[in-house]
Curated annotation (Swiss-Prot):
Protein name: Uncharacterized protein y4jB
Keyword annotations of the record: Plasmid
Pfam families: HTH_Tnp_1 (PF01527)
Gene Ontology MF: a single term: transposase activity
Length: 152
């Protein structure tokens, strides 16, 4: 008799514990196929996500695409940088160079640099300080500042 009571009690506890939990049943009728997005659909999603103050999650939901996939497409299109939400960096470009025909011309350039007064640049960003002494071209100083700002 105890055995029947224990069984009935166990069954009642099981039903009470799981009551109301299983309301949705999904029937899989065949193999799941990946969705292939056309270039036009991708372009439309990318255009909407490039708008200022665009809600990427809402755009992804509206088109039925995963937000991570949309961000992957945005990164590939250059809309965002390697870190989520970071603006894309400028595309690499060639730097013009000048080839000296004469060795003396090269030595004259080096002598001109050495004759100039030594400069000092202090760069203070985000609580850190960097001091650069000597002659620094404005382009190099600009590149250093932009690189330091990009790490924030």
């Amino acid at each position: 008799m105890d055995e029947r009571n224990d069984s009935a009690r166990s069954e009642a506890m099981f039903e009470a514990r799981h009551e109301g939990r299983y309301r949705r049943v999904e029937v899989i009728t065949g193999p799941v196929r990946r969705r292939n997005w056309t270039d036009e659909e991708k372009a439309l999603m990318l255009a909407e996500s490039a708008e200022p103050d665009a809600n990427i999650s809402a755009i992804a939901r509206r088109f039925g695409v995963n937000r991570g996939l949309l961000n992957t497409w945005r990164r590939a299109a250059g809309q965002i940088g390697p870190v989520l939400g970071e603006p894309a960096l400028e595309q690499p470009a060639f730097v013009p160079i000048r080839i000296a025909d004469d060795q003396n011309e090269h030595q004259a350039d080096e002598a001109g640099i050495a004759e100039g007064a030594a400069g000092r640049i202090e760069i203070e960003l985000g609580g850190g300080r960097m001091i650069v002494t000597g002659n620094v071209s404005p382009d190099l100083a600009h590149a250093v500042v932009m690189a330091l700002r990009g790490r924030r």
